């Protein structure tokens, strides 16, 4: 999980790696600020896919996390309207799948902001999915098992709905 020697998150979905590379290539500008566990804050700015300057230390921190800010390139896109609900849905899922991870979605144009953080992992996700349903049992059945490098997490709660909802997530 994670880059920089592991020990990070166990599920990712295009937030780093090729995902940010593609966003960078399609942006007029992109800025990345990383609060790293060495106590430093690193920063780098890109314009149209190219680094403007080398990575630099811009401060000290006692937090960890990454902030990525970008502006889609109007030379590539005719319109740059984002579907808030689509982004919110996926980022909420990622926050559930990465228990304790805080994800903030900000739309500067619409002056809109949402924050997602769930400490309960899949159990919290199942509770969220069933919040407006009649559960057949109150306690969510859950299994969380790690064998070597392989981790499996399962959460189940039956309800009286006629339609079943089965979600499966896998990482590398």
Residue map of PLM features:
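GHKL-type ATPase core
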Residues: 2-128
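GHKL/Bergerat-fold ATPase module in large chromosome/replication-associated machines
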Residues: 105-172
């Amino acid at each position: 999980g994670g880059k920089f020697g592991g020990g990070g998150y166990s599920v990712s979905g295009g937030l780093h790696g090729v995902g940010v590379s593609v966003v960078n290539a399609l942006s007029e500008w992109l800025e990345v600020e990383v609060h790293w566990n060495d106590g430093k804050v690193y920063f780098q700015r890109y314009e149209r896919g190219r680094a403007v300057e080398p990575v630099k230390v811009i401060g000290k921190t006692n937090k960890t996390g990454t902030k990525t800010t970008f502006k889609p390139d109007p030379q590539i896109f005719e319109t740059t309207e984002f579907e808030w609900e689509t982004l919110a849905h996926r980022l909420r899922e990622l926050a559930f799948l990465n228990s304790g991870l805080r994800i903030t979605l900000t739309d500067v144009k619409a002056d809109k902001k949402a924050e997602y953080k769930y400490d309960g992992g899949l159990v919290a996700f199942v509770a969220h999915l069933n919040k407006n349903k009649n559960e057949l049992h109150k306690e969510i059945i859950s299994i969380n098992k790690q064998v070597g490098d392989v981790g499996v997490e399962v959460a189940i709660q039956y309800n009286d709905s006629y339609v079943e909802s089965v979600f499966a997530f896998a990482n590398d």
